[in-house]
Design a protein with these regions (language model features):
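Surface/interface-facing alpha-helical segments and adjacent flexible terminal/loop regions used
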Residues: 2-249
Length: 249
């Protein structure tokens, strides 16, 4: 991945790095934590980006989520829904998921006239429109970090997938700086990530999830929504712990 380009997606089951771990208990390697965060953010980016392929569905069906059990109730709820749904997959599963994804996250279906497209500005602006104030803030954050979307992607920059990719990139940057003994630089990236998570993901994700749950029809995407909520909440704690450990705050 080019460090100055926002990647399009990661493939669930191949790049989610579940065995890398997010345990911040004594003895956990910081690099392992950072890689685990990055990989999981990449998986979430993929899940909200576009309908899954058959290969992605099959990969997720055999993915071992056990290392993450007990993170929090929301995460456990989400994993339970996802794994139970995929346990009963059949020849029509991919199409069923594609229809559900398109209905909810591509905005082809609404609830009381409102869609659940995963854009921050839709949920953080009074008008509920694309490309409002938060969009410009996100664009500025990418620019400051020397990141940009891949050419050909016409989604606005405040799409949830891009927000997750930003978090993944910043986690790996912090990891690389630690490898180079640049602790101060790593802490700066982690502080940036912590602020970005709070301001541009946690600030609107609950409202997005609430609306999406009124539209999605499959247990799989109900699980994805809960899993993401649990992970974001957990990562806020992880970032606090990492900054405290590295900067002594």
């Amino acid at each position: 991945m080019d460090d100055n380009e926002m990647p399009e997606k990661a493939v669930p089951g191949e790049a989610c790095g579940l065995n890398a771990g997010l345990d911040t208990a004594p003895g956990a390697e910081v690099a392992e934590v950072l890689e685990g965060r990055a990989a999981f953010y990449e998986m979430l980016a993929s899940l909200f980006f576009k309908p899954l392929t058959q290969d992605q569905v099959d990969a997720m069906a055999v993915q071992d989520f056990s290392p993450y059990q007990g993170i929090n109730d929301a995460f456990d709820e989400g994993i339970n829904h996802v794994t139970r749904y995929l346990r009963k997959r059949h020849t029509g599963t991919r199409q069923e998921l594609a229809c559900d994804f398109t209905s909810a996250f591509a905005g082809t279906k609404t609830y009381e006239g409102k869609s659940a497209v995963p854009y921050e500005s839709v949920f953080n602006s009074e008008e509920g429109l694309l490309c409002q104030g938060s969009y410009h803030e996100v664009y500025a954050a990418y620019k400051q970090a020397s990141l940009h979307k891949r050419e050909g992607l016409d989604f606005p920059e405040d799409h949830l997938s891009f927000l997750c990719q930003f978090m993944a990139v910043m986690s790996r940057r912090a990891m690389n700086k630690l490898d180079a003994d640049d602790v101060e630089g790593a802490v700066e990236d982690l502080r940036c990530s912590r602020e970005f998570l709070g301001r541009h993901i946690l600030s609107w994700y609950p409202a997005f999830e609430e609306r999406a749950l009124l539209i999605v029809g499959t247990r799989f995407y109900r699980g994805v929504l809960a899993m993401a909520r649990g992970f974001f909440a957990f990562d806020a704690e992880v970032l606090d712990g990492l900054v405290e450990e590295l900067a002594g705050e």
